[in-house]
């Protein structure tokens, strides 16, 4: 599988993926052609590519379909159980992926909220690859997601959404890093982000013009 970086905020991801079935456990460079290979890496010698981590997991799939108003919604649920290995280090994989196959994206969030009400789930936008890079080089992990630049002419609802997405995404990455290494400062920063997010949501009623 070749995955582009795409966009991922607070567990909701949009990206391109290419899948191939290989007969051998070896990278087939012929598959990495111009149809999928990033233009920015066109001068890279693919023969120099070497594995620095591996993922070994079992995936169980199920299709969930229901009616939402007059529209049909289809979601593929995939449960991944296994591990990421980089040298002598390894990390367990226990992920539930929800992929929207048909319908409105809002339905995907509604399903996730219903599942989280009964199961110990937490949104997370950290990929298996990012876990592998972190095992190989702990300094490669970025706690703060890229912040959107706000301008004076940015609409109020756009500014509110940008700040909320940043705080939500950053808080989840802090929680994930705290789970990984247990540094108390990360816990303190995580709680502060949650407080900032709560304050932001509380100020919404004051910022929205009244009719």
For the regions a protein language model found, what residue spans apply to each?
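Phosphate-end processing signature that detects enzymes handling 5′-triphosphorylated RNA
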Residues: 1-211
């Amino acid at each position: 599988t070749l995955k582009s970086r795409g966009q991922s905020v607070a567990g909701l991801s949009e990206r391109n993926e290419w899948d191939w079935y290989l007969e051998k456990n070896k990278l087939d460079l012929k598959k990495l052609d111009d149809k999928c290979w990033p233009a920015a890496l066109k001068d890279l010698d693919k023969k120099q590519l070497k594995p620095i981590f591996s993922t070994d997991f079992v995936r169980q799939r199920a299709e969930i379909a229901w009616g939402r108003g007059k529209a049909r919604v289809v979601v593929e649920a995939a449960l991944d159980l296994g591990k990421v290995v980089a040298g002598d280090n390894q990390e367990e994989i226990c992920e539930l992926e929800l992929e929207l196959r048909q319908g409105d994206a809002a339905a995907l969030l509604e399903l996730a909220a219903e599942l989280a009400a009964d199961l110990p789930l937490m949104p997370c936008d950290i990929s298996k690859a990012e876990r592998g890079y972190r095992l190989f080089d702990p300094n490669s992990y970025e706690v703060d997601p890229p912040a959107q630049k706000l301008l004076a002419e940015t609409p109020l609802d756009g500014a509110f959404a940008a700040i909320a997405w940043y705080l939500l995404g950053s808080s989840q990455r802090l929680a994930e890093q705290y789970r990984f290494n247990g540094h108390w400062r990360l816990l303190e920063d995580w709680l502060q982000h949650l407080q900032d997010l709560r304050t932001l949501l509380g100020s919404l009623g004051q910022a929205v013009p009244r009719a």
